Amino acid sequence: SGDMTSKDRSLLYYYNFETGLYTYSDIELNNLILKVEYRAQVGTFKNVVEIIKTLVPLKEQLQDRNLIPVENGIFNLKTKELEPFSDDYIITSKIATAYNPNAKKPHYFDVDGWFSSLACNDDEIVTLLWEMINEAINSNYTRKKIGFLVGASGNNGKGTYQMLLVNLIGKKNVSTLKPNEFSEKFKTAQIIGKVCNIGDDIGDAYLDDISNLMSIATGDGITVEEKGQKAFSIYTRAFCLFSGNSLPRARNKTGWIRRMLIIPFNADFSGTVENSDIKEKFVSDKNVLEYVLFRALNLEFEQFSKSKAVEEALREYNKHNDYTQAYIEDAYIPNEYHLLEKVPLIFIRRDIKRYFEEEGLKQHLPYGFGNEFAIRLSKTTKDVYKLKKGRIKIDEMEQFPSWTVSEVNTKVPIYLIVKE
């Protein structure tokens, strides 16, 4: 496993007949070497491992989206049958819950009703809660999304939903990285061999580098490094799911927005009699987990379902993550500047800086801001705006705040946002 083009940058795995998995463990390999040669020294371990790596073939990890390893075998999504484990399949992890073809919803806990309460009776959100479980248990396939459970209330159920997922998949199969940790040198290695990553209590701190997180979402390779070891490449399609009261902003705005799946958790159970059995008992109950796994495995969908609430949450996030867009929607359009045929770019620059100051933001306008602003304004209003050089008359300046008169030279051509 690792870089499929280089043994030097790949890890050495061995097949465990008891679990049906290929395992990567320096300690276990050393124990196997000692069983053959009890006099082996520390230096011997490394030499033997290097010899084995040289001799054994380099094989790709199982990447068939239709084969999902569960506790008691490999579930085939096409045939809906459970197949036995085999050393022919290069599998490094499996779901901790067994597949039960006769699984039924337990009479003592209505999972569907609970999901509905989490979603505030929004059927579209309920569907997405099930689809995210399907995505989380299949590390051989990615729908190229990063999940975010967001809710301002501290008692909205998102933590309990995550607990259900962790119990379903198994703690040892879940890494717990937060978004910012994917850019830290030695942290990303934690995702090796994991089925899913679930990070909770994330903050709204700015994410300067999201390249690793984006690569995992799309199934591309990332370079990882463990302390004292050489860097190597891995390919993982582990679903990354995060939760928090707010969302982090990111540099790569367009690509980042395209990958985000924001699920609003707007329920508030603070004023109700909380059923403590849900968190303490039901989400770890064997029958509940087998029913949830059965339902999730039998879902069929290519892309995540559409949801009005999700689209609205994404639109709101996009506005707050993109301060230029926020200025257009919160200040420029409400002041009806978009209705004017000509708006001096120097005015927009000054006005947007004022807006940033009022919002407590420290932002610098990028090179090429004028063209970018015209494009954003066109998309938002559905009209056409261009950045052009031309003159603006004194009487046209009366439509702007008084301070603008001293800033704009009406005698020479200047840059304008022109409505066509």
Per-region residue spans from a language model:
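Feature primarily recognizes SF3-like P-loop helicase cores of small DNA viruses
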Residues: 1-10, 35-420
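Short, small/acidic-rich helices and loops at N termini and domain boundaries
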Residues: 11-40
